[in-house]
């Protein structure tokens, strides 16, 4: 085997791109990408949270989180305000139109999830999620 074919990182990135493209195509009618859907879904669950907290929940750095929020803010799906307790911190909340977009996208996401599990088998999909959740990197 060639080193490239043995590289865990490259194999994971290739699979990630294929899966992301699949979910993006299923969510396309809503105008959302799966990364944006994840943000809206998390805000729907958590309510208003700081940018830093949202970034931690999604395992993203603050700069990337900001870049991901900008289109959602332009679409008026999220509202960014200064924190009432710390003027340096920004709080992100889901707007009414963001909630409606989340509801529409959730239907399509559930279909994509079912299609993915049908194609790969429910046990394989569950094992994949479990493996990825418990994956250790380094020591």
For the regions a protein language model found, what residue spans apply to each?
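Helix-turn-helix DNA-binding elements, focusing on the entry/boundary residues of the two helices
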Residues: 51
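N-terminal leader segment of winged-helix/HTH proteins
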Residues: 1-30, 123-126, 130, 134-135
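Residues within the alpha-helical elements of helix-turn-helix
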Residues: 42, 57
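Charged, amphipathic alpha-helical coiled-coil/dimerization segments
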Residues: 20, 48, 70-130
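Short helix-to-turn junction characteristic of helix-turn-helix DNA-binding domains
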Residues: 12, 43-47
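Central "turn" residue of the DNA-binding helix-turn-helix
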Residues: 47-48, 59
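Short alpha-helical "packing" element that flanks the helix-turn-helix/winged-helix DNA-binding module
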Residues: 36-40
